[in-house]
Regions:
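Charged, alpha-helix-forming regions
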Residues: 1-282
């Protein structure tokens, strides 16, 4: 049996495709690769309980098989994922300046006797899981699970959600330009956190996020504490985050990604990134 056949067999216990709300994709948060993968698996098995609350039940043996977790490490992984999921706050801003800030998951529990992990989503999230009409992106589960970098996973989600809703243009050879400011991208990828160690968002950051025109540079450079930043220098961010993600996306996904740097001001400071994304499935 080939490596691809093994992966296909392992993933057969879950649907091949996930219809994921762009609300969940575009929200600002930081998560580990394992957490993102467990969340993706949970979203394929979520149902409404008797109280009308979204609940997903996962077998730990399935998680171990699909995510290749071995030995006694599973218990530690589950605790870390549960703690992170239960504390995740979703912040999303729409184009008109409206925003929503809410918790994603209320309770995560594990029963050792049955070997099951139950994830209870907050009731307010229901509309962003079920009955999605247009504001969603189809994600290939086996392909998403193949990513080895959390940066690849998140950047793929972000770029795919934009390209998925872009119209095909034969004059541009199906190349879509997706632009992000550097600070904005850092927030979306999670190299900059807006929550402190206690899970709180600074009031000044909250006020800035409530504005119709958000100044991401001001948030990242002035309001976020240094200890909440990773790969702050551009050279580190480019080498250890951006280039790693683009390389893996090009190797494993249905997107081909290149990018150009946007410069301005004195000395040609880099302020943004123009991604050239080609959907190879169109």
């Amino acid at each position: 049996m080939t490596k691809d056949e093994i992966i296909s067999t392992e993933c057969s216990m879950f649907p091949d495709m996930l219809k994921k709300s762009n609300f969940l994709i575009s929200s600002v948060y930081r998560a580990t690769l394992l957490e993102n993968k467990v969340l993706a698996l949970a979203l394929t098995k979520v149902n409404l309980n008797e109280e009308g609350r979204p609940v997903a039940t996962l077998k730990t043996r399935e998680i171990k098989q699909v995510l290749h977790v071995t030995g006694n490490a599973m218990s530690t992984y589950l605790k870390d994922v549960a703690t992170s999921l239960a504390g995740r706050t979703m912040f999303v801003e729409s184009e008109d300046g409206s925003f929503q800030c809410m918790n994603l998951v209320g309770v995560v529990s594990y029963q050792s006797g049955t070997g099951t992990m139950e994830i209870k989503f907050e009731p307010e999230i229901k509309d962003y899981i079920f009955d999605l009409k247009a504001n969603f992106t189809m994600l290939d589960i086996p392909m998403m699970l193949s990513f080895r970098s959390g940066w690849s996973y998140r950047l793929y989600e972000l770029l795919s959600s934009k390209a998925y809703h872009s119209k095909y243009d034969k004059d541009t050879s199906n190349v879509f330009h997706i632009k992000y400011g550097v600070s904005e991208l850092k927030l979306h990828l999670g190299t900059v956190q807006i929550k402190d160690d206690k899970g709180k968002i600074n009031r000044d950051i909250q006020r800035e996020l409530e504005k119709k025109e958000i100044d991401y540079d001001y948030i990242v450079n002035e309001l976020v504490h240094e200890k909440l930043k990773s790969f702050d220098k551009w050279c580190d961010f480019k080498r250890r985050v951006l280039d790693v993600a683009v390389k893996e996306i090009n190797e494993k996904s249905d997107l081909h990604v290149e990018y150009n740097l946007l410069r301005g001001g004195r000395g040609g400071k880099i302020y943004g990134i123009d991604f050239e994304v080609t959907r190879q499935d169109v």
